[in-house]
Amino acid sequence: MTLKINEKNNVDVIIITTGGTIEKTYDEFDGSLENRGTSIKNRILSKLRLPYTNIHVHPLMSKDSLYMDDQDRAEICQTIESESQKKAPIVILHGTDTMALTAQYCFERIKNLEVPVVFTGAMIPMGFEDTDATQNVTEALLAAKLLSKGFYISFHNQIFEVPFVRKNKEKRTFEAISK
């Protein structure tokens, strides 16, 4: 893939946020962790040095992926199709429980994709001291700029091609499955 570089020699990357653990916030009143909108700009992106990357955040939904259904997945697909017309790589923030399912759903339905679409999430919410969110987002941003068109999951320093990936709940990460 040839990256679309703008007039300032920067690369545009689109981040579509859907919720999941990566975006959960702690409610001091009742002690719960809830999806209440995106905070990726303040919690991660503002801390990264990305002088040659223009990030465009598209907040789509704010849901725990366990509560996503095919209507939500269809909305994610439609948003990918719409945003991909801008010819910029796409990163999807998604809950890990159904990330592989959503990625495969989109892989099966979007046939003329011209950009890389990289799904990522976290086991521990951003904003928590031992979060894996910063690592996973940083790696997904770089992967989106380097990979060819197609669907991928980027997680814990690994890139997995969709649909050959699944979550390993025991190891608390993702792993490749046979082609």
Language model features with spans:
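Active-site histidine-anchored catalytic micro-motif
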Residues: 2-179
